[in-house]
Amino acid sequence: MAVNTLLSTAPSRVFLSFPNPSPNPSPQLHSQFHGLSLKLTRQSIPLATAPKPLSVVAVTKKAVAVLKGTSSVEGVVTLSQEDDGPTTVSVRITGLTPGNHGFHLHEFGDTTNGCMSTGAHFNPNGMTHGAPEDDVRHAGDLGNIIANAEGVAEATIVDTQIPLSGPNAVIGRALVVHELEDDLGKGGHELSLTTGNAGGRLACGVVGLTPI
């Protein structure tokens, strides 16, 4: 009841007084309402907390291609890439004749006409054929894999021109193993600068993303 009486008799005017600036790091704001005093300090106003720093998490991408052909040649190729780093290609192909065999990434993942419909080597930069370590090469030039006496070729290839994402991603394209050795563009044959004179296409498989 005392509070109600006080408010009902209080004048309608409100007087605010501000102290002179002082070195006090917590200045106060005084408000007088007919005998009532309210003090505000900077500490009484909650401040927004600073955002937490962002953490960068490595992104791993993986893909696989299952190679099949009209002969007994078959195999599995897995590809993996960390962030924007090089792509690691793990190859295991069986049924080959012993020796070197050209191994390339081709432009299309179209196998409606077998390996012949996979197109030419993947070549987004318009280069001539070369070795994987050459500056001038097709992006799809992965060199040779070597089959042992049992016809099994196992290899690990690390390459920077066959990413699993981005405008030149290899997803949906095809890996092809060839009949002959790739001359890496240095054989002097009329096909050296286009196919490496690697002969027929023994088996192929479309590159597709796989769960990590």
Curated annotation (Swiss-Prot):
It comes from Vitis vinifera. GO terms for cellular component: chloroplast. Signal peptide: none annotated. Disulfide bonds join 115-204. InterPro entries: SOD-like_Cu/Zn_dom_sf, SOD_Cu/Zn_/chaperone, SOD_Cu/Zn_BS, SOD_Cu_Zn_dom. It is an enzyme of class 1 (oxidoreductase). Cu cation binds at residues 104, 106, 121, 178. The gene is SODCP. Keywords: Antioxidant, Chloroplast, Copper, Disulfide bond, Metal-binding, Oxidoreductase, Plastid, Transit peptide, Zinc. Pfam families: Sod_Cu. Destroys radicals which are normally produced within the cells and which are toxic to biological systems. It catalyses: 2 superoxide + 2 H(+) = H2O2 + O2. This is Superoxide dismutase [Cu-Zn], chloroplastic.
